Amino acid sequence: MASRQPEVPALEPSGPLGKMSLPIGMYRRAFSYDDALEDPTPMTPPPSDMGSIPWKPVIPERKYQDLAKVEEGEPSVSPPAPAPPPATDSAEKAPVVKAKATHVIMSSLITKQTQESIQRFEQQAGLRDAGYTPHKGLTTEETKYLRVAEALHKLKLQSGETAREERQPASTQSTPSSSPQASPKQKSRGWFTSGSATALPGPSLSTMDSGSGDKDRSSADKWSLFGPRSLQKSESGGFAIQAYKGAQKPSPMEVMRAQATRRAEEPATFKPPKMDIPVMEGTKQLPRAHSLKPRDLNVLTPTGF
C-alpha cells in the first residue's frame, strides 16, 4: 500500500470533472458502496497491462483553460480542434452564442469519448453479449440508438398482426355460417371463437326440439338457413356454448324426504346395527324411567336442529 502512494495524484487530479476524471477501469482505494452507486464507472478491477493501454479518458486541463477563455469572450482564441465547422458557422454571431455552442460540443465530445472507451473495455473483458445492457453512466440517447431500429421493427410487426386479427373476426362473422369453408381465414383464427360463432343457434334448436314436438318443429325450421342440423351438431362438439346447467344438487329437505321414504319402504335394510357390548344394553333401559320435562329438551336437543 505504501509503495502505491505516489500514484494517487495522477489517478485523482483535482479537476473540474471530479469523479469522471478517473480512468474507466480504475476505482478508488477508499471504496464506499454509496459512492459506487452514483459513480458511472463499472466496478471491475483494472486490467493487468493498465500502463500500456492507449485509451485513458483523462481529459487534460488545457482544454478547459481554452474553454474558460472562450466563455470569457476573447475572440482571438480559436475553438477546439475536433469541432471546427459549427464554431466557424457561429463566428459571425455574438461570442456568447459561440461559447454556448462550444460548451455543448465539448460536453457531447466527453460523453462520446467515455462511451467509446467503455465499449472497448467491455469488448476486452468479454462483457458484450446480446443480453447486456449498459450501466446508468451513459446518457439515454447513447444507450438507445443501437436498439431503436429493432424495437421499432418489433412494434410494427406486432401492430400489423393485431390489426390483421381485428379485421378477421368481422369478415368471418359477416359471412353466413351455412358455408363455413367459404371463408379461408377462419382456419387461422382461434378455434374457440370460430366454433362458438357457427354453433350458437345449437342450444336454441335443442331446447325447441325437446319441447312439445310439432309446434316447435315449425319454428325450428326458421333456423334451417343457418345450415343443416348435422353440421351444427358435429361442430358444436366441445366448443359451443351449450345450455347445460350441470347435475343439480338436491336440497337438504329433498334428501331428508328421500331417506324417510326409503326407511318406510324398507324397514329391514335400515335397521341400525346392534351393539354387542352388554354394558350398553344395560344402560339402554335407563332413559325410559326418566320423566322428561319441557325445560330439559333444551339440553338434550342436538345443536343442528
UniProtKB/Swiss-Prot annotation:
Residues with PTM Phosphothreonine: T44, T175
Motif Flavin-containing monooxygenase motif per record, residues: 67-77
Superkingdom of the organism of origin: Eukaryota
Skewed-composition ranges (Low complexity): 169-185
GO molecular function: oxidoreductase activity
Coiled coil segments of this chain: none
EC identifiers of the protein: 1.-.-.-
UniProt function note: Potential NADPH-dependent oxidoreductase. May be involved in the regulation of neuronal survival, differentiation and axonal outgrowth.
Family statement drawn from the similarity comment of this UniProt entry: Belongs to the P33MONOX family.
Protein name: Putative monooxygenase p33MONOX
